[in-house]
From Swiss-Prot:
Species name: Panthera onca (Jaguar)
InterPro entries registered for this protein in UniProt: Globin, Globin-like_sf, Globin/Proto, Hemoglobin_a-typ, Hemoglobin_oxygen_transport, Hemoglobin_pi
Tissues expressing the protein: Red blood cells.
One cellular-component annotation, GO: blood microparticle
Lineage of the organism: Eukaryota, Metazoa, Chordata, Craniata, Vertebrata
Keyword Transport among record annotations: yes
Descriptive protein name: Hemoglobin subunit alpha
In-chain residues carrying the UniProt-annotated modification Phosphotyrosine: Y25
PANTHER family, sorted: HEMOGLOBIN FAMILY MEMBER, HEMOGLOBIN SUBUNIT ALPHA
Gene name linked to the record: HBA
Binding-site residues, heme b: H88
Residues where N6-succinyllysine is found: K8, K12, K17, K41
Record PTM Phosphothreonine, positions in chain: T109, T135, T138
Functional note: Involved in oxygen transport from the lung to the various peripheral tissues.
Length: 142
């Protein structure tokens, strides 16, 4: 999915407003994913998946950091996320559908925390961006 200039601007503006809350929102989105899609828990058998656990918070920060990197390199996602793509494809072997689940939960989390900025245009741009990130992360599965 190709991101237009308007999409890129919407993503950068929205992510800029998230600022220091990115890790917190990443953890909240993970918790939502685990609650809404329980099969995703199978990838984290060694984690304490309870609300507010330090392990979920730390992984939420990793998700946020990866997305922050993706936003910073929005014109070159494949190179920016190459190492992460390798990790998920060859070592972790995460089912690609789980990226869609997490993307949905990220959208819900952002909409809850920033309803005034979460316009239909921003929603569509973020959805396209998360889809593009998911596509890159699953590109090496073939």
């Amino acid at each position: 999915m190709v991101l237009s200039s308007a999409d890129k601007n919407n993503v950068k503006a929205c992510w800029g407003k998230i600022g220091s809350h990115a890790g917190e929102y990443g953890a909240e989105a993970l918790e939502r994913t685990f609650c809404s899609f329980p099969t995703t828990k199978t990838y984290f058998p060694h984690f304490d998946l309870s609300h507010g656990s330090a392990q979920v918070q730390a992984h939420g920060q990793k998700v946020a950091d990866a997305l922050t990197k993706a936003v910073a390199h929005i014109n070159d996602l494949p190179n920016a996320l190459s190492d992460l793509s390798d990790l998920h494809a060859y070592k972790l072997r995460v089912d690609p559908v789980n990226f869609k689940f997490l993307s949905h939960c990220l959208l819900v989390t952002l909409a809850c925390h920033h309803p005034e900025e979460f316009t239909p245009a921003v929603h569509a741009s973020l959805d396209k961006f998360f889809s593009a990130v998911s596509t890159v992360l699953t590109s090496k599965y073939r």
